[in-house]
Every structure is written in C-alpha cells, then in structure tokens.
Curated annotation (Swiss-Prot):
Residues annotated as binding [4Fe-4S] cluster 1: 16, 52, 81
Signal peptide: none
Organism, scientific name: Thermosynechococcus vestitus (strain NIES-2133 / IAM M-273 / BP-1)
Name listed for the protein in its UniProt record: Ribosomal protein uS12 methylthiotransferase RimO
Classification via InterPro entries: Elp3/MiaA/NifB-like_rSAM (IPR006638), Methylthiotransferase (IPR005839), Methylthiotransferase_CS (IPR020612), Methylthiotransferase_N (IPR013848), Methylthiotransferase_N_sf (IPR038135), NA-bd_OB-fold (IPR012340), Ribosomal_uS12_MeSTrfase_RimO (IPR005840), rSAM (IPR007197)
Residues covered by the Radical SAM core domain: 142-371
Binding residues annotated for [4Fe-4S] cluster 2, in chain numbering: 156, 160, 163
One GO-annotated biological process of the protein: tRNA modification
Main location: cytoplasm
Cited Pfam families: Radical_SAM, TRAM_2, UPF0004
Keyword Transferase: yes
Amino acid sequence: MPNPKKPKIAFAHLGCDKNRVDTEHMIGLLAAAGYGVGTDETEADYVIVNTCSFIQAAREESVRTLVELAEANKKIVITGCLAQHFQGELLAELPEAVAVVGSGDYQHIVEVIERVERGERVQQISAVPTYIADETVPRYRTTPAPVAYLRIAEGCDYRCAFCIIPHLRGNQRSRSLESIVSEAHQLAAEGVQEIIIVSQITTNYGLDRYGQPQLATLIRALGEVDVPWIRLHYAYPTGLTPEVIAAMRETPNILPYLDLPLQHSHPEVLRAMNRPWQAGVNDRLIERLRQELPEAVVRTTFIVGFPGETESQFEHLCQFVQRHEFDHVGVFTYSPEEGTAAYDLPHQIPEEIKRARRDRLMELQQPIAQRKNAAEVGKIVPVLIEQENPQTGEFIGRSPRFAPEVDGVVYVKGAATLGTIVPVEITAADIYDLYGIIPASVRFYP
C-alpha cells in the first residue's frame, strides 16, 4: 500500500518499447518503496516524464510534454534519452525540472526522489550508460494484461551513420540466458499470452557476453516457457543466420514474424549508411527467408531522403518494395542528428522531397498490404483478445501477423474473454486491419 506521507508521483511515457521497460521498472521501484504512482498529473506532487530523443520529431514531442507540464507549474523529473542527450540545457531552460535522470540511471529513481525531497536539484547522469535491469528489479507492466515486452540486451555496438542510439544508450550489454528465461517464466506465471523480445539489435544477443551471438540458443530455451506466443523484434540483416531461422521454425511458440529494419535497398545508400551493403545482400536475405520460413510475416522500415539519395536510388527502393511484397512497411524521412556520421554529409535532401518520397513509398505499399490482408479472409486464425468496446460488444485483438502498436488489429464479434486466444473466422479486410467472427461451435483456441 502507498505510504500517505510520501509524495504522489505520475508518469508520462514517451518513446519506444525499450523505453517503456525502463518506465515499468521505475514504477515498480517507486511502488515497492511506498510511493503512490499513477497517471493523474493533476493530483501528483511530481511528474516523471520518460522521454525520447531518437529523431527530431520525438524530441519535439518530448519538449511539448515538458513545456505543458511546466506551464501547469508541475515539478518535473526528466528521464530517458532526452535527459541523457541534453541534461544541461534542460536544467537551464526549465526551472520546473527538479531532476534529470539518464537512460542508464533509472535504477536510482527512488534515491533521486528522496534527494529532491531534501531540496536538491538532481543531475543523475552516467556519461556512458552501462546498466541493464534483470528479473530481480521490480517492474509494473503498463501494457495490456496478456502482453509483455522482454528486453534481452541494451545498447548497440553498431554505428549506423544516421543513428544516435549508441550515444544515448551506450554499447551493447546482454543479460544472461538464465536471467531472461527466468523472467519469461515469471511472465508466464502472471498469465501473459504474448512476449515480445526486444533490444537494439536482437540478433546480436549474447555477442558481448558469450563471444558469439546466442539468439538461436535463447529461442530454443524460450520454447520451454509456457507462453503461447513469443515474437521477435529488431533483427539485423546479417544476424538472421540459418541457425536463427531454423530455431524459429522448430520452436512452436516462436511466431513466424520478423521485424527486420532494412533501411534501404540500394548498395550505395546502404554503404553511406554504414549498413550491410554488398550488392543484393537484402534480396538474398529475403529470398532465403521466404524459402526457409515460407509462412513468415515480415515487417520492415526504410529511411528516405538520406543525404545524397538520388531519384534513381529511390526508384531502386520502390522496385525493391514492389518485388518483395512485405507484409508491413514503415517509412521514415531522414532526420539529421548532430553527432552522427551522416550529419555533416553533403547533398542534404530538402524536406519537401523527403516527404514526397515517403508518401510515394507508402502509396506503393498500401495495395500490397491490402492484398496480404485480403488473403486472410475465409481463414480461421488465432486472435489474442485485448480490448472490448462496451457500447458495441465488439472485441479488439491481434492475430500472429500483427505486432502491438505498429501493425493493425482484428475487430471481432462473438463471445470471448479478455486476455485469451480465440479462433476467429476472418470475414473482411482493409489495408491495415482485419474483421471477423468467433465461430459458435468453438470458444477457445487450443
């Protein structure tokens, strides 16, 4: 129970699912220390804002949130990547900021609040983040009850020319295999139906700790955990080895779903990005994946408008997308990030051209996505039920082809229980979502 003598704390979460795990650990630590924690900023003595600083748009969202809270005269604790990136500027510009906490220092959040309560203005920032929480650190999940993110590593050893993450999050540090499997068993005991494996580069898991990547070994170990769906995010092209693909194929609870950010298709652009660039590398990977795991659902992301990207190179990317027909595609316009190799490159692309290229690529993808979804009509597929509309009685869930937050959903009619996986007959589809009914003869998916 919260200690009424301690201040009330509200959280505002921004950013990626790795950042969400940090938020959940901070909530868990504060709750374990007796603090009342919630989302009601009006009642809170302090608002902790866990920020993102990955690209300009994310920084702008973080700053807007901070300014709104400052205008409401809230005492703000700024955590996460924006704090890591701009700690001095934030303290100088926001008198309401009583503390800044770096991306590798969230484990100190209770001590930070205690110091603030004593009148100190706290700057808790490690110059080089090295921390990663394990299964022993308290955590309060903020996702829908049947879903949990499981972070297997933090930081990144690669230096993609456009990416500031290594500066914000440090180099890769992997958890032990035993620690990860232990947390997976904890989540299973809590009734979790879907675990989403995350890190900066999931396919590099274990390289720093064991001397070589151990994702295939981890996949097989997670196959012993009583969770029906386990999903992998953030694969790196060269890390998707035959051993990893075989482990996915042979482990029943690993969904045949891959989040595989490719960023571009043209070798010259990929080389400038400091990505795997040898001619045809991504084509060969997709072809091998389709051959060895033909049922795989593939999500990818691309960056358009990278410095020097020509019209012909962009056309190469368009043809690549049309040729491979990915299930889900996200497109970002290049965001120049100070401190990255690409920031000072010549031939920066005007914003209006970047936006036009993004829009064209998404327009090319839409009929592909429509066809992929339409192919589901008439099938009976498992759907994890996550929400209910009390007005209509309709449920909202996801099939294995949809990851939370980034992909579509399935709108379901029929009798179901929240947090369960049920069979749904797909009756209709649009570009992003599916629609279906629960057959009367079967209530729950085995």
